[in-house]
């Protein structure tokens, strides 16, 4: 039997993800792709960047760039919203980037909306506030001092601007959609910020890749880059300053997983992508 996109992006699941996965749509990547293609052509905000031990972690930026480049090819105008730890990551691919200050307020975000008038918003591995209004890592340690409040956009414009969240641990923007399930199973205070569609993956990058594979099938066009390109991009971010979110080391690994595992996931998604294009 052919593996689904969701089965691929949930390989090697840990941290209670198989449990909370029950509360997410079986075909969440397809639904995300369908939602994106329903948006009017224009600006799409993409946000990522998760602070870990003085750096941004390697999970998030790669998936965001892959998704942003796919959106460009489909006629959208991706704009990256992030903060200082991701400085220089997105300029590598000439993507328009806004660095949101740590003390940003509602006026900051109102001006962003008025300036760009986004047709949709996507978050990939971006920490969101918990019920105590804190941004916390998987160990429950506050990283609020190092996290711009970009999730305010998803709160203030819920129901106004369509949104998609991609996460893998429970503390990311979008997880508010299943916060109750996370609270019951995982030993952390979940993010309470919801999105219209939630994609849960073992690694958030994989969730973003899964959305791109689903987009490919719907438009009949290969949008997913080859593994060597993805590895090269992650390597460049590590050289700039990015760490593995599990080991906290400046290595070309993601959430403790090697590039061999990354290649395995990309290869599996490429098979599905090719099948969708040929269908």
Set out the residue ranges of the language-model regions.
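A glycine-rich helix N-cap at a beta->alpha junction
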Residues: 94-119
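C-terminal functional extensions of proteins
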Residues: 173-279
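Short internal beta-strands
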Residues: 76-83
